[in-house]
Amino acid sequence: MVRPRKSVARLHKYRPPLEGRGGKMRLDFNENTIGCAPEVVRALRRALSADRLSCYPEYEAARKRLAKFFGVRPEELVLTNGTDDAINVICQAFVEPGDLLLVPAPTFPVYQFFHEVAGGAMERVYYDENFRLPVRDVLKILKQRIRWVALANPNNPTGTIISKRDLRIMLEAAPNTVFVVDEAYYEFSGETVLPWIRKYPNLIVTRTFSKAFGLAALRLGCILTNAKVADDLRRGQNPFPVNSLALVGGLVAIQHAGFARRYAAEVCANRATLCRWLEDQEIPYVPSQANFVLTRLGPHAPAIARRLRARGILVRDWNYDPRLRGFLRFTIGSTAQTRRLMRELRQMRDLIEDRASRKDWSKFATFSATGWFA
């Protein structure tokens, strides 16, 4: 019998619910809910030629333009097939069997997935009851031989931010540990450590075009780090990491970056609107600096998600995580989409306000922008 590597055989499959999403209001995967800039669509149509499709991609000119956009040197940028691929490239370059990855929990599961594919082992530190990172606990764990640390900032699914002060403390406490700061939601938070990549040789920043820029289908991202680490990453990388159409879309998207900025501004305004409404309804939520809000709806959360789906609205049910039972994550979209979500939730008060459910809430203390709800 043909057998896979032991590290692969041990894996729990990561299979997000991707099927059957067409034609629905997609508030489940933190995508741009209105689509990319129209100039991108026009450019992609023009690029669809037999000659273009039969030719392998060229990267140097695109790398220079993207580097200029991000404010780095071309040699400090590594093109990737989205953030998932960026994590895989990092693991291929740095992870030996048995190496330890430290991640906060809960967080984006892809870090663990690719680390375990590479044969690595896990260390976790759990967010506190306010969904803040316990930095003292992190520093204790860093005294072990941690190979790398994965930090989504803002974190997914909580939307919370790790302060620059705390990031600096961790970077300086473990100079031989690789720190990957995933800034997939940078456009919604404005928080970045990208200017630090030359100061801290152990820092890697990842960015994506899948969120604010609305190019999730094209799979385009990049790794931003010092030139030495970037060169090491390219050594183990597929020589054709990004397809030509993704490059066309990405380059036109940065040329018309105002579209993404305006969309992000609308999302941030709608995020505030939704949070105020949740407070008015006394529904617990986690204050977010991303394009989503994690909300505690109680034991009937899966039923609420199913009812929303039946009405054409997709949201992410986090009930599979023991620490997030009763939580739904809502992607924030346009003003019209946000109003519709609130209207539909208002019609489900029979599930949200179930008194038996409220008793179960006493097991949880979930922070909101104005205080505690129990």
Language-model region placement:
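Short acidic capping loops at alpha-helix termini that bridge into adjacent secondary structure
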Residues: 73-77, 97-100, 183, 201-202, ...
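PLP-dependent aminotransferase-like
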Residues: 8, 93-151
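PLP-dependent enzyme catalytic core of the Aspartate aminotransferase-like
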Residues: 307-311, 316, 320-374
